[in-house]
Amino acid sequence: MVQVDLITGFLGAGKTTFLRRYAAYLTAQGHHVCILENDFGAVNVDAMLVQDLLGERCEIETISGGCDCDTHQRRMRTKLISMAMRGFDRVVVEPSGIFDVDEFFDVLRDEPLDRWYTLGNVFAVVDALLPEKLSPQAEYILASEAASAGRILLSRSQLATQAQRESAIDHLKRALAACKCSRTLKLSLIHISEPTR
């Protein structure tokens, strides 16, 4: 089965920066990787930002456009079916910043995808400078991403003070509690890069 890794986070959180490092790591380990860039816009800017990763061990596919969730899910499902036939070891999905993780899991459970793919790593990239106030919809997405992640990456932590980093972690905890998520946010699941001097 092909392992699918998911990298979630709001627009500007640092998903593409992490994706570049992660894809380079996987290809250095000998994996044949396909990056699936998923964006609601007509032009997929993130796909342009990772073009230099293309090579013998790394390919890029995109899903762009689509005015509603159903259209987007159908396009993702169709793209995953075609990718399953091409012999990748790993697929790394970077969805748009407005993405419901549960909908992605539903797509992976559909036939025939459930026979070809297995869920691998789920990363939630959260900006250490996360605003204190978000819309109710953004709070829900933040909680959904944090609840589903095996690892939470606090990005741009080198630009944040210790108080701002702690505030972002507290915000995550509040978002999970507001959604009545029983998951306890363990600090061991949050990776905070050390500030650079």
Language-model features, listed with the residues they occupy:
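Conserved small/polar residues in nucleotide/adenosyl-binding loops
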Residues: 190-196
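Nucleotide-state-sensitive switch-loop elements of NTP-binding domains
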Residues: 2-8, 13, 17-135
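Conserved C-terminal guanine-recognition region of P-loop GTPase G domains, centered on the G4
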Residues: 99, 104-117, 126-179
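Short mixed-charge
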Residues: 180-188
